[in-house]
A protein has these predicted regions:
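Conserved P-loop NTPase motor core
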Residues: 1-612, 617-631, 684, 705
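Short Cys/His-rich zinc-binding micro-motifs
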Residues: 886-903, 907
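Proline-rich low-complexity regions
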Residues: 113, 220, 408, 710, ...
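Generic detector of short, well-ordered, non-transmembrane alpha-helical segments enriched
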Residues: 3, 392, 445, 493-494, ...
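Extended, charged helical/alpha-beta scaffold domains that provide interaction surfaces
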Residues: 33, 321-329, 335-343, 572, ...
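Compositionally biased, intrinsically disordered low-complexity regions used as flexible
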Residues: 1, 178, 274, 868-878, ...
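Short, Lys/Glu-rich amphipathic helical modules
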Residues: 444-457, 691-692, 746-751, 895
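Hydrophobic, well-ordered secondary-structure elements that form the walls
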Residues: 449, 497, 797, 833, ...
Length: 908
């Protein structure tokens, strides 16, 4: 705590004091609602809605609504919100971030603001990090909402548009951040409003808000289709890159003369970049038989070479990615989980595939994209929950205008956080780590060992096997067992090695997890997985088989809870869960996420980090000075140093990296804000067309503007008729406005004419053609206008996205010309946007004036779509996305990947 906090009290303490009267008002109503019968309590929802309709605000009814929800939770779920959980609910309702420690019941806290805000009828989105949690919480907490008369929806991948539409129409919708974002993008690719699924962005509660809004902020959501580029060049570039010699440096100095460097490319370990040197460029020119790598004609080759050296010099197997079943799969740097379905952009993924000699996929074409930053900033009110947000408080304020309020724990925190032990070498560090693990195992204290990569977790596993210490390894390679391993990490004598924060979201309970043991017992009894899923689910059902399975599961759960209780006492007696960090992460928040796994709900626990000056963080950010100091002091490699100087140095290094990443995320946002403004313009215009606004007037205006623009382009000087290029103007409009004999005048006629006269003649011809088309197609023409306009908007918008990406890729060089790259990107980007708008006008008018009906086809509303290349879901297809898949049968595996049959999952 800083001096200011000691003198004036922390910001969180002051904010909690401010809302205390509201908390007391909620608690004071406990007896009132406890005395209500079920029917009266359930009727409160309708009463609250009537009060809102009569002019009351959500804040006015908050105490009563929270108290009613609190009582209902006790009756339906068997859980009553603690006072600190009521505090958390108020913070979330106010559109802020509530920092709550692990095990404090964030899932239950969200029910209070979700219920209150759902009463407005505008919808509430509860955002989770994965589909399992979304599905679980929608069923579990959904029982509470449904009991109180609200509807609950679930939006996850694999659902049909009709299922999604029903989910978003519900009062409260659960889903993942990815699915909410993708549904937004898909809604802005449809041709008919009936194909849209979302209905607005009123209020979102984001679980693990730091993971979604900070960690994933630099990863845009992209809907893509197959590109047309060949993959051969990736393999050729990789074969060339394999012949090059790299030079690894901690940090590259831009002032260094690269001509003197005797290496082919430089790997900057701090910035994680690879840069080809003049020597490397000369080798490339010789290898590919070109005159200059910097020639504009060789930009594509240069890009492939740059990605190939990045794949070989920067990206490391089993750290940044794994190769599994012939596929390159990204490893999440923050959680250690496999990111199935995600791919690096700009050809980097293909470069890694070429390096690893697996099938190189075609580079995808971006059809629609948005960052999480800009998606979540669309909500009228945004709130979040996490156990670790305070270190990122400034970023939440600057980017999202969210403040972080730290909530106290319901029970006093009994965890002991020991000082870091810093060793001179990694050998000394690992020796100490093995000793600590062995000591914990000997006294049967469970220990969770956190590592920063798959490679390091497997190295520690190998050393433990040599010592004969039984253990479990949890990393991206074994993610299928993640929840099971983490759930049992609190058993006496359990040794669990985990990369980063794998298993986050699964509580580690002292003594073991009774629910997992009960599930395991069901498996041993031969129960099918889908029935086990139903037995442990919370959804309403009348199926007798499922009801019997649930009753049996509850019996087993009761039995194992009784067996685990003395085991939990044993673990508490030896100090609770021991958390051992083997390396400091670049972010203090990730370190804190490891720490908070211990000491849940007042349990004892211990945390300690054992690090060395040879670790990447220390080596790249200030370790040399400390290494020299230790050498001068004659410190042995097996002697730990625990000093404030070292702790300050580590925190300083982390703060510098956090600042660097913050600047990178801000920079991403600066560029995306340019695209976002353009996206808002395009999507708002699209929405007006979808909403049924007549486009005929817009089409006529497009004709007039396009003709006027063309006339001014070809007839530059109003007075100098000799410079008029009437032939060029005629050729440009030939076949859809003009014909061969149009715009041919005698010299005398021409002298009397102005540009407005020419424009008037052309507009008259265009109007004539337009009216003829309306007569030809009859009532169907208005529908054709809509579809043609949307098709051209979508097609050219996709091209524009690609063009903007190319512009961004090269804009950084403007800095060398004393030009702000972001300003240059904004100015040139809007010039390109204007050109795209002109293209939309030309293509739309041209198509509408030349389109012809198919012979013997009655032009019905649905049939107008077919010649215009729209998909079954109503989206315009620029390029083929995928072959249409056959709908799964009821007994087929569900395409969402849950492992259940389709009839038991998304086919319900």
């Amino acid at each position: 705590m800083g001096l200011a906090d000691k003198l004036f009290g922390s910001y969180s303490a002051k904010e909690l004091k401010r809302i205390r009267p509201q908390v007391d008002a909620v608690l004071a109503l406990e007896d009132h609602y406890r005395r209500m019968d079920n029917k009266t309590l359930q009727g409160e929802t309708a009463r609250f809605k009537e009060q809102l309709a009569a002019g009351k605000t959500l804040d006015d009814i908050l105490p009563e609504a929270f108290a009613a929800c609190r009582e209902a939770a006790d009756r339906v779920l068997g859980m009553r919100h603690f006072p600190v959980q009521v505090m958390g609910g108020i913070i979330l309702h106010q559109g802020r971030i509530a920092e709550m420690k692990t095990g404090e019941g964030k899932t239950l806290v969200a029910t209070l603001p979700a219920y209150l805000n759902a009463l407005s009828g505008k919808g509430v989105h509860v955002v989770t990090v994965n589909e399992y949690l979304a599905r679980r919480d929608s069923e579990w907490m959904g029982n509470l909402y449904r009991w109180m008369g609200l509807t609950v929806g679930l939006a996850v991948s694999g659902m049909s548009p009709d299922q999604k539409r029903a989910a978003y129409a519900a009062d409260i919708t659960y889903g993942t951040n990815n699915e909410f974002g993708f549904d937004y993008l898909r809604d802005n690719m449809v041709v008919y409003k009936r194909n849209c699924v979302q209905r607005g962005w009123n209020y979102a509660i984001v679980d693990e808000v730091d993971s979604i809004l900070i960690d994933e902020a630099r990863t845009p959501l992209i809907i893509s289709g197959a590109g047309e580029k060949s993959t051969d060049l990736y393999e050729k570039a990789d074969r060339f890159a394999a012949t090059l010699t790299p030079l690894r440096v901690k940090e590259m100095d831009a002032k260094d003369d690269q001509e003197d460097i005797r290496a082919d490319y430089i790997v900057d370990e701090k910035a994680r970049t690879a840069t080809i040197t003049p020597q490397g460029a000369r080798k490339a020119e010789q290898y590919f038989g070109i005159e200059s790598l910097n020639d504009p004609d060789n930009l594509t080759l240069a890009h492939h070479i740059n990605q190939a050296i990045a794949a070989r010099g920067v990206m490391q197997r089993d750290i940044d990615y794994v190769v599994k079943d012939g596929e390159v799969i990204i490893v999440d740097e923050f959680t250690g989980r496999l990111m199935i379905g995600r791919r690096y952009s700009n050809g980097l993924h293909q470069a890694i595939e070429a390096k690893e000699h697996v099938t190189v996929a075609r580079e995808n074409r971006t059809l629609a994209t948005i960052t999480f930053q800009n998606y979540f900033r669309m909500y009228d009110k945004l709130a979040g929950m996490t156990g670790t947000a305070m270190t990122e408080d400034q970023e939440f304020r600057d980017i999202y205008r969210l403040d972080v309020v730290e909530l106290p724990t319901n029970k006093p925190l009994a965890r002991q956080d020991l000082p870091d032990a810093v060793y001179k070498t990694q050998r000394g560090k690992y020796s100490a780590i093995l000793d600590i693990i062995a000591e914990c195992y000997s006294r049967q204290q469970p220990i969770l060992v956190g590592t920063t990569s798959i490679e390091k977790s497997e190295m520690i596993s190998k050393l433990l096997r040599a010592r004969g210490v039984p253990h479990e390894v949890l990393n991206a390679k074994f993610h299928e067992k993640e929840a099971e391993i983490v759930a049992q990490a609190g058993k006496p004598g359990a040794v669990t090695i985990s990369t980063n924060m794998a298993g986050r979201g699964t509580d580690i309970m002292l003594g073991g997890n009774a629910e997992y043991l009960a599930k395991d017992a069901l498996r041993r009894e031969g129960m099918e997985e889908e029935l086990i899923y139903e037995a442990t689910a919370y959804g309403e059902t009348q199926d007798e088989e499922i009801l019997a399975a649930r009753a049996h599961f509850q019996e087993l759960l009761k039995k194992y809870k009784a067996e685990i209780a003395p085991e939990a006492d044993k673990v508490r007696a030896v100090g609770g869960l021991y958390i051992l960090g083997t390396e400091r992460h670049e972010s203090r928040r990730i370190d804190n996420q490891l720490r908070v796994r211990a000491g849940r709900q007042g349990d004892p626990g211990t945390t300690k980090f054992v690090i060395s000056l040879e670790d990447d963080l220390m080596r790249l950010f200030g370790g040399e000075r400390l290494q020299t100091l230790m050498d001068n002091m004659g410190v042995d490699e097996n002697m730990p140093i625990e000093a404030k100087l070292l702790s300050n140095s580590i925190q300083s290094a982390q703060a510098r990296i956090e600042g660097m990443h913050f600047e990178m995320r801000k920079n991403v946002l600066k560029y995306d804000d340019v695209m976002n403004r353009q996206r808002e313009i395009i999507y708002s215009q699209r929405r007006r067309v979808l909403d049924g606004e007549s486009v005929s007037d817009s089409i006529r205006k497009m004709m007039e503007e396009y003709i006027t623009s063309s006339v001014h382009q070809y007839l530059v000087d109003e007075k100098n008729h000799d410079e008029w290029n009437l032939d060029g103007l005629r050729d440009r409009l030939m076949g859809w406005i003009t014909e061969e004999n149009d715009l041919r005048f005698s010299p005398e006629e021409l002298r009397r004419m102005t540009r407005d006269d020419i424009a008037g003649l052309l507009l008259e011809k265009a109007e004539g053609r337009y009216n003829a088309q309306r007569e030809l197609f009859g009532d169907a023409f208005e529908e054709i206008e809509r579809v043609v306009l949307l098709r051209n908007v979508d097609t050219l918008w996709m091209d524009h996205i690609d063009a903007m990406e190319e512009l961004k890729r090269g804009i950084g060089l403007r800095g060398y010309a004393q030009q702000d790259p972001v300003v240059a990107y904004r100015l040139e980007g809007f010039e390109m946007f204007d050109q795209m708008i002109e293209g939309i006008k030309e293509n739309t008018v041209r198509m509408l004036l030349t389109i012809r009906p198919r012979p013997q086809v009655e032009m019905k509303r649905e049939q107008t779509m077919k010649p215009l290349a729209t998909g079954e879901d109503g989206t315009v297809k620029k390029v083929p996305m995928k072959a249409d898949k056959k709908k799964p049968g009821r007994n087929d595996p569900c395409p969402c990947g849950s492992g259940l049959k389709y009839k038991k999952c998304c086919g319900k």
